[in-house]
C-alpha cells in the first residue's frame, strides 16, 4: 500500500491500524534546534482524543505520545522524528461476525477490491484513528509556525443546517483568546448557535442516526509569498490535505463556491495601505492569489459527511453478492458527528501544509 506520506521538505509518514498495537508517524525534514517535549504533542492530542465528552465516541484512548528519535537535550536534531501512540482500548470482537459484509458508507468494499484483503477491525487503515498521527505531526508544525508568529485556528462552523459562523474581524487581534474559547466548548464552537447545534446532534443520536458538519480554519500572519505557481499552489496543497482526511467531502477557500455567484466588482480584493504596508481592503480570495499567499488571513472550509456507522438496519451485500441486512455491531463505538473531532485534525493538516510552504519559500530567491 503506497501513499502513506505527505509533504515535500517537511514530510510525514503515518502507519498503524485502528485495532492494531499502535499508531505512529515519522517526520523527515524537521529543522534542527526546535525545542520540543512529549507534553507539547500530548496537549494537542488531548483535543482530538475520543471519549473526551458525551458528544464523541466512547472509545477511551490515553493518546500519550512517545518520542523515539530525532531529539537530543530537548531539541530537534534534524534527524527523522519517530513518534508512537499505543492503542489501549481496542475491542475487535464486535466486528468478528461481519467481516464478509460490505458496510454501507465504509471503505471495506473498495479496499477489498483493490488489495484483495482488508483489516475489518474498526476499519483498519481506513479508520479515522489514523488522524491521531496527523495531529501529533501537526503539533510540531504548529510549534515551528508559532516561532515565526503564525497561528492556525479551526472551529466547528456548522452541524446539519445550523451555522455558527464567527466574524474574523472580531478576533484577529486576539487569536489566543479565540483558541481558548473554541477549546472550552464541547463542540469546538465559539458561537451562540452551539446550543442549537447540540440539539441537532442529540436528536440524530436518539434516532440512531448521525449528522454532518463543516469545519472552518484560519491561518493568521502568513506573509506574502508562500506557495508556488501552477501545480504546487498553496490552496491546491491545502485542498489535497483536507480531502485526505477521512469523511471529508469538499474544500473551499475564501468565498469558495459562492464566488461563482458574484461579479468581479464584488469579488476583487482592492489594494490599500495599512501601517505603511500594502494590504487589501477585503479578503474574498481567502488569502491567496495565483496560488501564493497574499499576507491576508488564509480562510478555508471543509465539509464532513455524516458518520457512516449508524444504529439503523440497512440493506447491503456480502462478498458473495448475497443481499443481507447490516446492523451496527453491539459494542461498537462511533462519533455521532465526525466533524467535531475533525477540528484539531483540520488545524494540524493546515499547519503541515504551511510549514512545508515556509521551508520551500527559503529556496525561491538566492539574494
From Swiss-Prot:
As to how many cofactors bind and how, the note says:
Reduced FMN (FMNH(2)).
Q: Which InterPro entries match?
A: Chorismate_synth, Chorismate_synth_AroC_sf, Chorismate_synthase_CS
UniProt enzyme class? lyase
Tell me the superkingdom of the source: Bacteria
In its keyword annotation, does this UniProt entry include Ion transport? Answer: no
**Record key words, sorted:** Amino-acid biosynthesis, Aromatic amino acid biosynthesis, FAD, Flavoprotein, FMN, Lyase, NADP
The UniProt record gives the binding positions of NADP(+) as 48
GO molecular function terms listed in the Swiss-Prot or TrEMBL record: chorismate synthase activity; FMN binding
EC number(s) for this protein?
4.2.3.5
Instruction: Name the catalysed reactions.
Output: 5-O-(1-carboxyvinyl)-3-phosphoshikimate = chorismate + phosphate
Question: What GO CC annotations are associated with the protein?
Answer: cytosol
Pathway(s) served: Metabolic intermediate biosynthesis; chorismate biosynthesis; chorismate from D-erythrose 4-phosphate and phosphoenolpyruvate: step 7/7
What cofactor requirement does the entry state? FMNH2
| Gene3D superfamilies from the UniProt entry | Chorismate synthase AroC (3.60.150.10)
Sites where the protein binds FMN: 125-127, 290, 305-309, 333
Q: Which GO terms describe its biological process?
A: amino acid biosynthetic process; aromatic amino acid family biosynthetic process; chorismate biosynthetic process
Q: Which PROSITE patterns match?
A: CHORISMATE_SYNTHASE_1 (PS00787), CHORISMATE_SYNTHASE_2 (PS00788), CHORISMATE_SYNTHASE_3 (PS00789)
In UniProt terms, what function does this protein have? This reaction introduces a second double bond into the aromatic ring system.
Q: Which family does it belong to?
A: Belongs to the chorismate synthase family.
On assembly, the entry states: Homotetramer.
Q: Which PANTHER family match?
A: CHORISMATE SYNTHASE (PTHR21085:SF0)
Q: What is this protein called?
A: Chorismate synthase
Q: What is the organism of origin for this protein?
A: Protochlamydia amoebophila (strain UWE25)
Name the gene that codes for it.
Answer: aroC
